[in-house]
């Protein structure tokens, strides 16, 4: 079967470039082409010659002048022999195309709906793979860093939401002219399309803006210094803008749907009151976190100190939450969770924001080096002036003799300066170097640091003071073998020790009252007291120890102990001597000795009581060991023997008074006859 076709061409199309100059070679073409002034017709058996015999490409040219579409005619008829194998396929395709064309003729919105759906499908599943393949082919890259690349972020954050938004708008535009049979369905259709338009618009632009804010915040955090205090402010601003974008998007979406946001805000006011009453702590923490992010008293990785409800908190800020508590990593690496509102009502010290660290200390020099203190202070000032890490201009640098400590009379030197660093470890190193230099200055001048003082005093009786030469006194350089006493400072003696000493001091006073009632006991006790004081001094000179018991206790023993037989024997031997003297002279001497011994006994007794109290107090504060401990019977015997050797007049005077009282009746009896 042969198909015959005709080709009609308009003369104005200009098949030849130049009709006046034609080569004879084109005679065959002229024989096949019949050109006339009217529409040209070409009758060619295509089965025999084909299109290769017609060379139109070299001769077709655009018209010089514009030709209306009505005058342009192009008709092509062709015929060819076809096989029987492809006839069923051609018929099937023809039927499908015919039916689809008829369906599209019945529903015109399908022309617009198909491209919109294709755009949505391409945006969801075709855009990202297409961009990845184009990146790999054009830029010669692999898929390893695809999700971290800028192309991926641009496609997913900006291009894809916009394409989805356009696809949703095209779908709504295609479905808008659809006519539904009922009025209710029309209203539902309109509201549904309006909802899709509003939702797609709000979501697309809100997502793009929020992605832009997040990318900007991420870029700033990567390029800025992590220790910069402005990071926290930018983070707060980014979070605030991010929240504001979505709040505005929700409000706009409600307005587009036809809801009044003013009514919702009014209802939200009542809800805010209820939320405030129910979750006051949560809302307070949120507002406090907003204040912390806005005012920035501290940021992440800063060292702060505060006191919350009596608990000292010191550590590094690890997390500042919006609703959750702030986490501080303590010095012992423990996590401390503190509600945000606690920081708004308590004092917070930010140690990281220090511009300088201060060195402030005192050095106490001994009072024995008072003549060197001027040179020491001057050299210490030179040490601080020569140190390059010490601030010399803006802040003070002080080295002064500030005070004399009254407890030990130490000379206190104030050292105060500032180190030019904000790092604590560097400050500690500079402080160590400065203190070592100051101690070298003290040792260079051969001065001594002050220590606690103990006062050592020598004990004397009245007779010892009169008989001791000035060279052996406390002002001389000669060491004296006399009893010593250690006295601690007053602040080391507590009230309990004082009460005990007062109770012990009350016993000798009671015994003194008993002595006052018995005049003979006074007379006998006075020489014994002197002897006991001398006996108490004798062991100290041998052992150079402080005899605490031998100073205070012999007073009681000498009064209460009766005279021994040896004393009576000595007094008996002296009776004849007393008889030889006159009665008047004996009585006057006895009165003088009684008055002198009683006054001496009172003074020595009072001194011994005071010394005993002091020694008891020092014994409780100082670990004084006694090398010689004698039993009470042996001490009594030693006291009596010491009294005999010292030649005391106490027992002799008492014996003389007894002899005088016996001799007076005898003399009276002898004179009466």
Curated annotation (Swiss-Prot):
It is found in: Plastid, Chloroplast membrane. The gene is MSL2. It is a multi-pass membrane protein. The modification Phosphoserine is found at residue 571. Belongs to the MscS (TC 1.A.23) family. It comes from Arabidopsis thaliana (Mouse-ear cress). Disruption phenotype: Msl2 and msl3 double mutant shows abnormalities in the size and shape of plastids with enlarged chloroplasts containing multiple FtsZ rings. Residues 510-525, 564-576, 617-642 have a biased composition (Basic and acidic residues). The chain crosses the membrane at residues 107-127, 152-172, 193-213, 240-260, 264-284. The keyword Transport applies. InterPro entries: LSM_dom_sf, MscS_beta-dom_sf, MscS_channel_2nd, Msl2-3_C, YnaI-like. PANTHER family: MECHANOSENSITIVE ION CHANNEL PROTEIN 2, CHLOROPLASTIC, OW CONDUCTANCE MECHANOSENSITIVE CHANNEL. Gene3D superfamilies: 1.10.287.1260, 2.30.30.60. Widely expressed. The keyword Transit peptide applies. Keywords: Chloroplast, Ion channel, Ion transport, Membrane, Phosphoprotein, Plastid, Transit peptide, Transmembrane, Transmembrane helix, Transport. Residues 492-673 are annotated as: Disordered. Residues 1-75 form a transit peptide. This is Mechanosensitive ion channel protein 2, chloroplastic.
